[in-house]
């Protein structure tokens, strides 16, 4: 899988598309055939790694990009060692390379995907460690930075910081009541 990821960009776009679709289908089939959580986690990590290495494909296929990110969010709840780290790292890589796609409203969508992500922030990050949450927030920050309209960008930042701000406010209230 490392070799597959390392040749990203080496093929023309159409060949890359056929190649990547075949690889992902085969890996998903392998994931279905494998027994045991350990084996499935290894295959899932490899799938995440590979799709994160092909931003050109992701940018050209919005529905696939959204599906990959949503699957990544599912992996953020997986407790098998290393899977959450890989999910957060892959999300960060995709966020950096495809940032504009998250802040623009895509065809067939009700809103930009960033709004959905921010609305579901707590549900997505609830099982992550503090360091993983940091990686997640940083990734969302990359997306927000790609928003060209300042007022919208400020609204998105406020929404992103809502949970930490509320936690801070509660901490301050608690500290004042203990004084």
Annotated model-derived regions:
Residues 1-179:
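Karyopherin-beta/Importin-beta family HEAT-repeat alpha-solenoid scaffold
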């Amino acid at each position: 899988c490392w070799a597959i990821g390392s040749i990203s960009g080496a093929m023309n776009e159409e060949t890359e598309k056929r190649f990547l679709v075949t690889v992902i289908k085969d890996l998903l089939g392998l994931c279905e055939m494998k027994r045991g959580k350990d084996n499935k986690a290894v295959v899932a990590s490899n799938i995440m790694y590979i799709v994160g290495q092909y931003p050109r494909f992701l940018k050209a296929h919005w529905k696939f990009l959204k599906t990959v990110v949503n699957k990544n969010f599912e992996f953020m709840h997986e407790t098998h060692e290393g899977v959450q780290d890989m999910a957060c790292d892959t999300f960060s890589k995709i966020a950096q390379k495809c940032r504009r796609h998250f802040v623009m409203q895509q065809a067939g969508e009700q809103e930009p995907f960033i709004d959905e992500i921010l609305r579901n922030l707590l549900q997505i990050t609830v099982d992550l460690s503090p360091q993983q949450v940091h990686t997640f927030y940083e990734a969302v920050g990359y997306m927000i930075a790609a928003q060209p309209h300042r007022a919208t960008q400020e609204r998105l930042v406020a929404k992103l910081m809502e949970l930490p701000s509320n936690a801070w406010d509660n901490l301050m209230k608690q500290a004042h009541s203990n004084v």
